Amino acid sequence: MSELMNLNMVLPEPLNLPFPARASLQELGRVHFVGIGGAGMSAIATLMLKAGIPVSGSDRAETATIQALREAGARVYTPQDAANIHDIDTVVISTAIHEDNPELIAARAQNLRVLHRSEALAAAMGASQVVAVAGTHGKSTTSSMIAVMLDKLGFHPSFAVGTVIAGYGSNARLGATGEGSWFVAEADESDGSFVRYQPAIAVVTNVEPDHLDFYETPERVYEAFNRFVASMTPGGVLVTCWDDEGARALAERARDAGIEVVTYGQSTEADLRVSRITSHGSESSATLRWSFECASKHYEGEQDAQLRVPGIHNQLNAAAAFITALLAGAQPEDAAAALYGFGGADRRFTLRGDVAGIKVFDDYAHHPTEVFRALETGRTVADGHNLYVVFQPHLFSRTQEFAADFAQALSKADRSYVLDIYPARELPIEGVTSELITGAGFSEVHYASDAAAAIEDIAMCAVPGDIIMTIGAGDVTALGERILHELHARYLKE
């Protein structure tokens, strides 16, 4: 086992588990997903349907995702009920499904095979070479970029990512299979299960403490990423960002353990340097220069890269994708052309509409660093005009840990409205409310107990050229349409 594993720590499950062999997709038989409508679960279900596996599933309520799965051939029930567990061989759950779930209880009683979501995804990977993208931020966009690049370069990869890719209308696709094929996966670190994929290329965009409701301490987060890198196939390559302190430390530990590492960033010390970054509306450009050795091969060159998405962070994400393409055998100019083919990912600075020159964007950011980057991009696109934000904190534990950091990030807007916390899987924590953020001393950041009032206020203040953003991992995304409606009512009455 790699030197990366030599830390004397007792970690929460499943981090203490050995790296398991992948199950065969065919041996799973008829598969039922408990919570099939989630981003990760729906992607795996889509892959299995395309592979001809009988799929059923359940969720708490009807959604567009569930309807799409039905149209693809899945049998989906709402709500969840023990009676749904029949004529199946394997049940797939995520960490969000607790032991008191009626369907899981029924599956246990029937002695059915129960797999974690990550085990099911590993089975779907089959014999493909895996590119697994992890990181506290940017993994959905970066994995989507890599999938699009490899596809446009003719590799016909399979992919499973955490967002719908523009131009593909899906978060998953079954491409070429078998030896020599590629599978691009977003590797979610939130519960430590990302050690199951055994990638040939592991991309780590950044490493910061997050998901402390699971990990409890920052040290456990860092150890989980150690395990992720150690889980690579023999001869695997770590691609990571030298600009990020946590990722840089991971790269140094990996190199000390004899693992191949290629770094990227704006730093002159990075193996691939990103420079001359400029933005033009919703597009951006940069110059990439690289010189490194990997697997006994020398890589060196310079290439201009144009993206159809804005922001410094996206140019860094693109650098990771570009290196991946080089390692897969692509020519630099072809890789750059393929990068321009990436049209964005859903809820990643996604334009929801434009009324009288006022643009409304939506973003999934839910960590202070992500919020800062989203607002930084918004500021660039606003180009001197005002930036208004409606932010919904995600999880009580995250709000408690990062309240002051959220406030500082949100102060980058001209005015930010903070809604009540979206609890997701958590119960309330005494004393933890959105007012921890709004009370941190930034005059631009305001508490909004009434979303309707915040929307009305923004619609009255915004003028042509301004940018409005809805930000968060909860249901704040639905407010974009309401904001557009208010803007229509104000500007387009006639």
Show where each model-derived region lies.
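Phosphate-binding loop of NTP-binding sites
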Residues: L47-K50, R70, T78, N84, ...
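Short glycine-dipeptide loop
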Residues: M232-L238, D383-G384, P464-G465
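Hydrophobic Val/Ile/Leu positions in short beta-strands of Rossmann-like dinucleotide-binding domains
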Residues: F33, V133-G135, T470
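N-terminal leader/targeting and accessory segments in enzymes
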Residues: M1-A120, E245, A270-R276, P310
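Nucleotide phosphate-binding/pyrophosphate-handling subdomain across enzymes
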Residues: N16-H32, G40, L47-A51, V195, ...
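C-terminal helical cap/extension that packs against the catalytic core
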Residues: A407-P464
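Beta-strand->loop->alpha-helix junctions that form or flank phosphate-binding loops
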Residues: S58-R60, Y77-Q80, L115-A122, A160-T163, ...
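Short internal beta-strands
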Residues: I53-R60, V237-W242, Y388-Q392, K412-P423
